Curated annotation (Swiss-Prot):
<comment type="similarity">
    <text>Belongs to the class I-like SAM-binding methyltransferase superfamily. Protein arginine N-methyltransferase family. PRMT7 subfamily.</text>
</comment>
<feature type="domain" description="SAM-dependent MTase PRMT-type 1">
    <location>
        <begin position="14"/>
        <end position="345"/>
    </location>
</feature>
<dbReference type="GO" id="GO:0000387">
    <property type="term" value="P:spliceosomal snRNP assembly"/>
</dbReference>
<dbReference type="GO" id="GO:0001650">
    <property type="term" value="C:fibrillar center"/>
</dbReference>
<dbReference type="GO" id="GO:0018216">
    <property type="term" value="P:peptidyl-arginine methylation"/>
</dbReference>
<keyword id="KW-0804">Transcription</keyword>
<dbReference type="GO" id="GO:0016274">
    <property type="term" value="F:protein-arginine N-methyltransferase activity"/>
</dbReference>
<dbReference type="GO" id="GO:0044020">
    <property type="term" value="F:histone H4R3 methyltransferase activity"/>
</dbReference>
<keyword id="KW-0963">Cytoplasm</keyword>
<keyword id="KW-0949">S-adenosyl-L-methionine</keyword>
<keyword id="KW-0677">Repeat</keyword>
<keyword id="KW-0489">Methyltransferase</keyword>
<dbReference type="GO" id="GO:0005634">
    <property type="term" value="C:nucleus"/>
</dbReference>
<dbReference type="GO" id="GO:0008757">
    <property type="term" value="F:S-adenosylmethionine-dependent methyltransferase activity"/>
</dbReference>
<dbReference type="InterPro" id="IPR055135">
    <property type="entry name" value="PRMT_dom"/>
</dbReference>
<feature type="active site">
    <location>
        <position position="144"/>
    </location>
</feature>
<keyword id="KW-0808">Transferase</keyword>
Length: 693
């Protein structure tokens, strides 16, 4: 059955109605899921297996039958481990229907159908009794309900319900315990992901300062955690202010509460500085003695950094304190971890832990609009002074006496740069109410409310009256739009340029003048694992899962690229970067598709895991900004990526299998096409052994 789905096209800006298979959202969820990554997480799998064996043995030693409840079974892997370890029966609960159906097939293929019952329900809907899903309560509780924040996938309510209704009072639990850790740091880089810094602009009259409104200064920020691969943040980017502090633990073998709580830990600062950021992670102990442990700690907090397990389904957390606060070395303070049933947040306090245990603080919520409009990388981008200087230098060469400027980018400070650098009049278009209000506040605090005109409408709908009857001599864009997911989605600027053509003066200049799409073939250190087939996992055949993911990838995105922040995922370039397509913003969008075909020669040995694509913008003939590679690759091919942007990754499936040979083809062929009518860029990359369609 087909269904019609409305979708806002991020490139053209139009609303499209697409005919989709009724299960299209299932396929996307499976295709972009972390199932493969979890199956490749050997440390996780081994520790779970060890913990399950120990739990089954403890129950058997009491002379009891081992009845296992596995919540969030996924592939059924943990249930199969339990039966292999000697469990008498397993009840495997999985709410996601396609996953539950796959688990049934995997369990059957591995010969465990007589000992594992897959229940396609949310665990809170599971019943116990003669006519229930379980005939009696289980005495072993096995779960994998955790995310990077530990509790973000509803672990606490699920455990709370299970202990009340589904398991025995003295049950064994795997994992047995989880502990959340925190470390207080000062970091200009990370703080720049949360607050707007004053921006300097060098003008002919000296330095001008763009200051943030007081509302942004006071705002506690976005309520959500920022989960990243913390191992890719250099220790030089932060100053440690505290030891690693165990903030709170959850014993999963006992009744768990999902009620809001606060846990305080007193510490003595290791250094004086500005307390700004809390780095946090957790570990899980699979047994009561804590001998079987799986940790998310970054390398500097590991006892043996050489044993570091890469994983993407569990990372580390960056939390921003509501306000930065000075602390003194040696002067005791308290760090408080607050949580409700799904979220964790932190505050810095002066009082003792005992006084804080009952102090519950409301979860911080953005009230300045900026954190709703700009995500963390966007804050970092706006705060990047080198980037601002780059745009300012380009603008100086473009501005002429009497310039009438129109700025088209979401929540951009380009309009302020244009004003300070001498534009006679500046208009800026903000499509959303949030960005309109935010920019009005920024202009007001900088005494620019009468100097820059903010227009709250979609740029395609601009009228001559909006521009006060004037013709635009300089059309500006970074370009940046909040709806963009892939690098080329910001080509929306070209569609805007085309729609406002009537408002441009003869000889009007557009900045950027042009854009280009670039690609390079890379070998990833680890990211390839998220799309790699597993085949066999701890002795269990999970090919059915591999096939399911492959089917969904073929259905949704076999020839699509996916956005990834590659500064978090090290890789080596195997080819030279290639310019694939060029887009001339001085001219309206052409009617005919733009195509490019070619072959990229591999210059370095390695596995061609995929092609990385990004955009570069030619601000002037002599000035270009890149959203991808920032510098030429080093001798070994190590890549340095723009940390403020996501790049697009097109995985080459033939090399993702760990058993694929290293000495593969020496070139990659490509075919890329830009479709002006839809704004889509279709692509195909193939190892030279294959032939492009």
């Amino acid at each position: 059955m087909k269904v019609f789905c409305g979708r806002a096209n991020p490139t053209t800006g139009s609303l499209e109605w697409l005919e989709e298979d009724e299960h299209y959202d299932y396929h996307q969820e499976i295709a972009r899921s972390s199932y493969a990554d979890m199956l490749h997480d050997k440390d996780r799998n081994i520790k779970y297996y060890q913990g399950i064996r120990a739990a089954v043995s403890r129950v058997k030693d009491k002379g009891q039958k081992a009845l296992v409840l596995d919540i969030g079974t996924g592939t059924g892997l943990l249930s199969m481990m339990a039966v292999t370890a000697g469990a008498d029966f397993c009840y495997a609960v999985e709410v996601f229907k396609p996953m539950a159906e796959a688990a049934v097939k995997i369990v059957e293929k591995n010969g465990f159908s007589d000992k594992i019952k897959v229940i396609n329900k949310h665990s809170t809907e599971v019943t116990v009794g003669p006519d229930g899903d379980l005939p009696c309560r289980a005495n072993i509780l096995v779960t994998e309900l955790f995310d990077t924040e530990l509790i973000g996938e509803g672990a606490l309510p699920s455990y709370e319900h299970a202990h009340k209704h589904l398991v025995q009072e003295d049950c064994e639990a795997v994992p047995h315990r989880a502990t959340v850790y925190a470390q207080l740091v000062e970091s200009k880089r990370m703080w720049s992901w949360n607050k707007l810094f004053p921006v300097r602009v060098q003008t002919g009259l000296g330095e001008q300062l763009i200051i943030p409104p007081s509302e942004l200064e006071r705002c506690p920020g976005a309520p959500s955690v920022y989960d990243i691969q913390l191992n890719q943040v250099s220790p030089a980017d932060f100053t440690v202010l505290s030891d690693v502090l165990p903030m709170f633990s959850v014993d999963f073998s006992k009744q768990v509460s999902s009620s809001a709580a606060c846990h305080s830990k007193q510490f003595v600062p290791l250094a004086s500085g500005q307390a700004q950021v809390v780095l946090s992670w957790w570990d899980i102990e699979m047994d009561p003695e804590g001998k079987i442990k799986c940790t998310m700690a970054p390398f500097w907090a590991q006892t043996d950094p050489q044993e570091l397990q890469w994983r993407d389904h569990w990372m580390q957390c960056v939390y921003f304190l509501p306000q930065e606060e000075p602390i003194m070395q040696g002067s005791p303070r308290c760090l408080a971890a607050h949580h409700d049933d799904y979220c964790v947040w932190y505050s810095l306090q002066r009082t003792s832990p005992d006084e804080n245990n009952s102090a519950y603080q409301v979860r911080p919520v953005c009230d300045c609009q900026a954190h709703l409009l700009w995500n963390r990388p966007r804050f970092g981008e706006i705060n990047d002074q080198d980037r601002t200087d780059h745009y300012a230098r380009a603008l100086r060469t473009m501005l002429m006496p009497g310039s009438i400027c129109l700025c088209v980018s979401d929540g951009s400070l380009l309009s302020v740069l244009a004003h300070h650098l001498g534009a006679e009049q500046v208009f800026t278009v903000e499509s959303s109410v949030a960005s309109y209000r935010l920019m009005k506040r920024i202009f007001k605090v900088n005494h620019l409310e009468d100097k820059i005109t903010v227009i709250n409408k979609r740029p395609e709908l601009l009228t001559s009256a909006d521009l006060e009857g004037k013709k635009v001599s300089l059309l500006l864009g970074e370009p940046f739009f909040t709806t963009s997911l892939l690098p080329w989605h910001n080509l929306y600027f070209w569609y805007v340029r085309t729609s406002v053509d009537q408002h441009l003066a003869p000889g009007a200049v557009v900045m950027p003048q042009a854009a280009s799409l670039h690609a390079v073939i890379v070998e990833f250190r680890d990211l390839w694992r998220i799309r790699s087939p597993c085949g066999d996992c701890e002795g269990f055949d999970v090919h059915i899962m591999d096939d399911m993911i492959k089917h969904s990838l073929d259905f949704r995105e076999s020839r699509e690229a996916e956005p990834q922040p590659l500064w978090e995922y090290p890789c080596r370039s195997l080819s030279e970067p290639r310019q694939i397509l060029t887009f001339d913003f001085q001219q309206p969008i052409p009617q005919q598709p733009m195509q490019s075909r070619g072959v990229m020669e591999l210059r370095r040995p390695g596995k061609s895991h995929g092609a990385v694509l990004w955009m570069e913008y030619q601000l002037t003939p002599d000035s270009t900004v890149s959203t991808g590679l920032m510098n030429p690759a080093e001798d070994k091919g190590d890549c340095c990526w723009n940390p403020h942007c996501k790049q697009a990754v097109y995985f080459l499936s033939a090399t993702l299998d760990p058993s694929a040979p290293l000495d593969g083809p020496q070139s990659v062929s490509y075919a890329v096409e830009f479709h002006p009518l839809t704004g889509d860029i279709t692509m195909e990359f193939r190892l030279a052994d294959d032939t492009l369609n």
